[in-house]
Amino acid sequence: MNGEVVNEHLLFVENFVEVEGLNKPRRIRIYKLSTFDTFTEEERALNEAYKKTGIKERATLKKIRDDKIASYEGIRKIDRKKLYTYEYDKDGKVIKESEDINRQITLFESEMMRYTENNLDGFSLIMDIVYMKIAYQTSIFKQILDRGLLIDDEQYVFFTSTTHQMKNGEFVLVQKDFYNDNQNKFMCGLTDDIINQKGGCNSGKYLAYKGLTLSSSIVPDGYEIDIDKCLLVPDFNTTTNEKVECIDIDHEKREFAGMGIRKEDVKIPQMDGAGMFLPSVLPASAQIRCSHLKGAIFPFDFRKFLGQDEVEGVRPNPIIKDAWGNIHDVIKEDIQVIFTASQLKMWKYYNSWDDYKKAFHENRMHIAINKFADTEPKGYAKTSYQFIQTLSSEKLTDEKLAELCADTIEYLDRIKTDLDTMIKIASKDDDYISLALEVHKELVYDEYIQSKLESKFKRESNDARGNKLILKDSLYSYICPDLYAFCTWLFCGIENPQGIIPHNYVYNSFYNDKPYEVVDCLRSPHLYVEHGIRKLVKNDVLEKCKEWFNDLDTVVSSHDLLCRLLMFDVDGDEILLTPNKTIIECVPDDIVPLYYVPFEPVKSDINNDAIYQAVVSCMENTQIGDISNVMTKNYNNADTDMEFNKIMCCYNNLSIDYPKTQDIVKLGKYEEKYNALKGENNPQFFIYAKGKSKGSCKALSKSNADRICDYIHKQTGNKKYGWQDSEKKFNPSILFNNENPVTINSEKYHELEKVMFTLRMKEQVLASTIKDVIKLKLRTRISAYAP
């Protein structure tokens, strides 16, 4: 499921750096253009007139402009001048043409990027792929969808709009010849005709699955996944009967019909997006990407499992059925990776696993890695304001609040006062400074180093005031299903297996040698009191977990509703585990998961009309950020309406699914409050949590988040920097080498002056280039576009 929007590309890089010996992902550039760039001169003039006109004439001019745009015939064009900037001589003649870096974005390599004929090693500009913003010009989008687009006289065709792009009104174009040469790879042998002959597909899902080729990924050297040693098996589902808070929806009327706590039979897709591999295949758990293939795979020795005499009274059998019902012997076929049907998104459109493998080989495809699990936890993690705002305000007394902030305050104090901490911060991400500080510790009093320290403190302080608090012995990790239970179902045929992890327990090897008994399980987005208090496995169960689960993934039970409470899949979703006593003690009592029946995605034939409807409808119904902020404003008010936030949480999740379902419930009686809260100013702590202006925020309230914001400021705002001592200044003369006397009138000195002059000229050229790169980075949005 979709989580909070994060910079996935930066995480992508960090996680590959952490796994030793792997090739790093390469960065590339592409153009990101807009439908406005396709305007004719007449359309542009009408648009300018529309923007400048008064309110009375505005509707008339809008209709004239829109009618003119809709009547365009032929293929729209974006000429070369939209892609480049120009310098002219005094006579108006072009003397220099340069790429317009303001129109470019930076991405990391992906499956599609590797299909291009470009060298990806040099931060290349890739012209085979272009991103476009619809900018609410839906008529132009339809024209491009039906007819393509000419960019610098090259024809481009619509490729897809990923889930993220659909919400933002964007889509992907590819150069026509590039598409024709690679369409079998993009679709791994499928065509729209094949899909339609087999009943069609939900348009939103179809677009998202096509977009998998654009997900950031690498094929790691030395870790090729052999498709012939892989197998696709059915999904493993169980049903759990537990108490839930039901939000009833009348799907025909699209209305909320009631709410109440009761016991329900809840279906749990235990392996939703997850598979497993023998521990020798990859160095750690990983998210995978390939055409139509997406999810996470986790290490588990299923051969060792098969070697047991019996499990729950049954001898494991290596002969199993794949997703199509065909028989396989896992041992004889040397199977090393087992995928589940939920990972191969279009599996029903292939006739068999052999059919998929045939297309895979014919198109010379590879299973790539999107991200490896973190194998070196830092030993601490930071909270989100969402985790804090849902704690009980009555339980979070001033004393408890001080306890919660203590580690963060200590860290901020160390930045200001402790020399070793200062040096560590000053040298972080800069090896040259680190080496210099090792030789001359006094460098910490240099003005440049001090400016870095002051900036670092302000950033960390602002983060803390935005409720990003340090939690010791806490970590983010992948969520892993109980693979022992899965193997018991798969190889022993037991429908509701016991597994290893008991009801209301979790396991993570990070806590094997730590004294904690209980953790809070948290995940973003965290909107309605989604605190999953769980016990850590101990004693005999712990020893069995050590035997079967070796990585730092959090293994969850197959017997409880943690997945419903936190709304996670196991396709690479991450969880925060914290044993923080204050948080656990301040969690509200008697939490039960919210439960509702969502709208079902509807299949249709794949055609341009269906694609147009899916993209435009999603663009016009995106309000996820608004819903989250409305809920935060509700928590920030003294009279928090918890029923309203339950409804908003459900509404938010239905909105997340909108690209697939194309359906949403009406707010009804909750709409008035929704609009009122939407119009309210932001809470004070949003100045630091989201960079909002003071003028757009309220005064400090008594909410959890605002109280922490105020407390952090009072505890750290008045302390002086320990390194801002007028008597402690860095003397650069200690860097001088006095062994060799210098004669400024000597011939050698004049030669050195000439060398220095040449170097200064080179420095100016380099500085200019660096400014261009910085300018590009500042204007570039590094977006994962991971479906």
Give the residues covered by each predicted segment:
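Short active-site loop/helix that positions an aromatic residue
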Residues: 564-566, 577-592
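Duplex nucleic acid-engaging cores and interfaces of nucleic-acid transaction enzymes
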Residues: 574
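Catalytic core segments in nucleotide and nucleic-acid processing enzymes
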Residues: 594-596
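Conserved small-residue
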Residues: 1-564, 583-585, 599, 604-787
